[in-house]
Amino acid sequence: MKLSAVLLAIALLALSLVQCLGLPDPSTKCVMECDTQEYRSICAADDKGSTKTYRNLCVMKTENCLQNANFQKISDKECP
């Protein structure tokens, strides 16, 4: 009985330390708070030469993270 209480206390302490230290939750790695109302279109290209228009830079960065892509801004206007 005492052993299970001690193990429970250790588990709770470990959990609270993780929360207090602010260790990142891997499931929220790509969550970025983009202003979806902000329309500052950009043209971006990836390593393969593909181009894509994004609503704004934040949206591009978020999609890069979610899709494991590598688009980089090449201009401050829509792609041709």
UniProtKB/Swiss-Prot annotation:
One record GO biological process: establishment of protein localization to extracellular region
Other known facts: The name 'pegasus' comes from the mythical winged horse able to carry Greek heroes over long distances.
Any Pfam family hit: Kazal_2
InterPro entries: Kazal_dom, Kazal_dom_sf
Oligomeric and partner information: Interacts with wg; the interaction facilitates short-range diffusion of wg.
Domain Kazal-like: 24-80
GO molecular function, one term: Wnt-protein binding
Signal sequence coordinates: 1-22
Organism: Drosophila melanogaster (Fruit fly)
Tissues and organs where the protein is expressed, per its UniProt entry: Strongly expressed in the developing fly wing but is excluded from the presumptive wing margin.
Name the record gives this protein: Protein pegasus
